[in-house]
């Protein structure tokens, strides 16, 4: 049974990877990316401080009646 000639496999695989890379690059060039929207009014994006944001509050639960018996 004759042996399989693998001497050209390295070249074939290398050229295939190069071709896939080139095709991918050509597809990416044609792709249209969205532009980043310009922020026209910065005041719309400022978080408004409310009184409870600056204070630490904790809600206490009433004692359970079951635990007292």
From Swiss-Prot:
The chain crosses the membrane at residues 8-24. Keywords: Acetylation, ATP synthesis, CF(0), Hydrogen ion transport, Ion transport, Membrane, Mitochondrion, Transmembrane, Transmembrane helix, Transport. It is a single-pass membrane protein. GO terms for molecular function: proton transmembrane transporter activity. The modification N6-acetyllysine is found at residues 55, 58. One of its GO terms (biological process) is proton motive force-driven ATP synthesis. The keyword Methyltransferase does not apply. The modification N6-succinyllysine is found at residue 55. It comes from the Eukaryota. Pfam families: ATP-synt_8. InterPro entries: ATP8_mammal, ATP8_metazoa. GO terms for cellular component: mitochondrial membrane; proton-transporting ATP synthase complex. It is found in: Mitochondrion membrane. Subunit 8, of the mitochondrial membrane ATP synthase complex (F(1)F(0) ATP synthase or Complex V) that produces ATP from ADP in the presence of a proton gradient across the membrane which is generated by electron transport complexes of the respiratory chain. ATP synthase complex consist of a soluble F(1) head domain - the catalytic core - and a membrane F(1) domain - the membrane proton channel. These two domains are linked by a central stalk rotating inside the F(1) region and a stationary peripheral stalk. Belongs to the ATPase protein 8 family. Component of the ATP synthase complex composed at least of ATP5F1A/subunit alpha, ATP5F1B/subunit beta, ATP5MC1/subunit c (homooctomer), MT-ATP6/subunit a, MT-ATP8/subunit 8, ATP5ME/subunit e, ATP5MF/subunit f, ATP5MG/subunit g, ATP5MK/subunit k, ATP5MJ/subunit j, ATP5F1C/subunit gamma, ATP5F1D/subunit delta, ATP5F1E/subunit epsilon, ATP5PF/subunit F6, ATP5PB/subunit b, ATP5PD/subunit d, ATP5PO/subunit OSCP. This is ATP synthase F(0) complex subunit 8. It comes from Ornithorhynchus anatinus (Duckbill platypus). The gene is MT-ATP8.
């Amino acid at each position: 049974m004759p042996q399989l000639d693998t001497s050209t496999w390295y070249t074939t695989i290398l050229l295939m990877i190069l071709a896939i890379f080139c095709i991918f690059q050509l597809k990416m060039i044609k792709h249209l990316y969205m532009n980043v929207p310009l922020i026209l009014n910065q005041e719309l994006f400022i978080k408004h401080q409310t009184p409870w944001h600056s204070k630490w509050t904790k809600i206490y639960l009433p004692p359970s009646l079951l635990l007292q018996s």
